[in-house]
Amino acid sequence: MSVKDFTQDLESFLAAFEERLRKVVKSEVEFIGLIEEDLVTAGGKRVRPRLVFLASAALGEVPHALELALAVELIHSASLLHDDLIDDAETRRGREAAFRKYGNAVSVLSGDYLLSRQMALLAQIGNLELVALCAEAARMLSEGEVLQFQVAALGEYSLANYERIIHGKTAALMQLACEGAAVLAEAPLAHREALARFGALYGQAFQMRDDYLDLMGSSEVLGKPAGGDVREGKVTRITLRLLEAYPEEVGAIFRRRGREEGDVRRLQELAQQSKAAEEVIQAIAERVEQAIGALRELPRSAARDQLEALAKRELVRLS
Amino acid sequence: MSVKDFTQDLESFLAAFEERLRKVVKSEVEFIGLIEEDLVTAGGKRVRPRLVFLASAALGEVPHALELALAVELIHSASLLHDDLIDDAETRRGREAAFRKYGNAVSVLSGDYLLSRQMALLAQIGNLELVALCAEAARMLSEGEVLQFQVAALGEYSLANYERIIHGKTAALMQLACEGAAVLAEAPLAHREALARFGALYGQAFQMRDDYLDLMGSSEVLGKPAGGDVREGKVTRITLRLLEAYPEEVGAIFRRRGREEGDVRRLQELAQQSKAAEEVIQAIAERVEQAIGALRELPRSAARDQLEALAKRELVRLS
């Protein structure tokens, strides 16, 4: 297949995805409809559906790839709705967070509605191994998010906890998107494992880059002021290094949740000066390289190249 | 089977249920463990597991009945955790609501954790029709809860909305408990339909009684002051009749959410005086009768008798 044909296939897959999503989340309850509109029109980058498409294309024909993309995206959307309470996010995909418009209650329950629609899709797909895989990803997602809350509340900062959190809250679903395609394709174990590894490592790099930019990015790129994680007491890989290197100064900044004028700027300075920033960029690069390495198990194809390109994009605009 | 043997079977089923529940919800994340303890030790009446047991016993042997009971109870428990945000409940099963101890965030995400464990159970049971049935019940549950919120927010009070709400928030899961057993037993359609009808009607009567007592019950029976629904702007069958009969006076009480001294007492008086209370008791009795009628499709058994007795209990302590 030529790259041009391939790109057209991706476009039509994503168009079909948007159309089906709109139908799947439709409810007779008006308040759910409001959330639904927010979700459907807000769009987002649809990273997970793209992963499902590319993983499927790399394997050849995969039955129910569209339904898998919908199921994964619905778990993701539900987690955004449930996680808005924690994050106290002022913006989410550039729009006012749903819970500010319609209240926490409707947000949480609409998230439950999306999860019920995801279960209906799984029943329709009719693959019990995929049900188990989704259950496992959803378990890691919720555990990762609770752990993040617990670590912030109790100050249990460690690299091990950070790794568990980013795997749970981001990488687990990316892995599901890729591995799920392999399950539906009944792919050989080596291909399934390769895609699972790719999804997990790519997801980790993705979240590490997000966390990096949360501190080091400009507010224009972020669409919100830098340092959001510090204000929520969330330690990321970069601030973990800073806490080790400057326990007193950075510890004090964390205890006051970066509330003093200049706190975030000071963390940025220390990150550059101590080379903590550089180190984290290096760690992301390694994760991207491992992800690409995992793909070597799959036969060369336009889709595999695209997965590689997707992973490499995590290295852009970091340094 | 004698009634004595039968009661022993129920006891051992419930004991096995508690033990498995403890294992199923176990998590390495400490904060989830706190919620879990609350849930496991708090117990509750386990109405849904009882229904699964009785429906299964009425059908003969049902594979995976215990796993079905766990799955249904986990959806119910998750909904309690997610619904605590709405209800602003001061007590839940006589204990401080989980979210007051550990925060809304942990509560919501721990609910998601329970839902993921429920999906894992479904994968283990391995029956795709049951996955579809659970998805449908979970959809109605979330839709019913959002609708309740919407109706309170917009004042869209009607009997039709009330019926949809009680079916969604309570009866759908009761129906799942009974119909799910029939699906696992591969029971004849007539038996499946009979159990589905019984579960739905019993669940409706159950919620109608709950709503009746919320206004008319003593605070000792309720374990909280009467009139909680009024304070949340929730119209139930009884207050719906009062709004029709005394639009100005009762309308004013609802608009101020029963905040004035004597408001709840006045509603109680009007309910007795206008016979609205009596009418609702009558409606509950009809629902119970229909539920028992549905059971007639099943062969007579100790389990069927117990289901009947369970339904009749909804008529106790009302008048």
Q: Model regions: which residues?
A:
Chain A
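N-terminal amphipathic/basic leader segments beginning at the initiator methionine
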Residues: 1-24
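Non-transmembrane, amphipathic alpha-helical segments
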Residues: 2-6, 39, 158, 162-165, ...
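Mg2+-dependent prenyl diphosphate-binding active-site environment of isoprenoid biosynthetic enzymes
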Residues: 15-16, 22-251, 286, 312
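A short structural micro-motif
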Residues: 140, 201-202, 259-260, 273-274, ...
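Mobile late-domain/C-terminal helix-loop "cap" segments
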Residues: 249-298
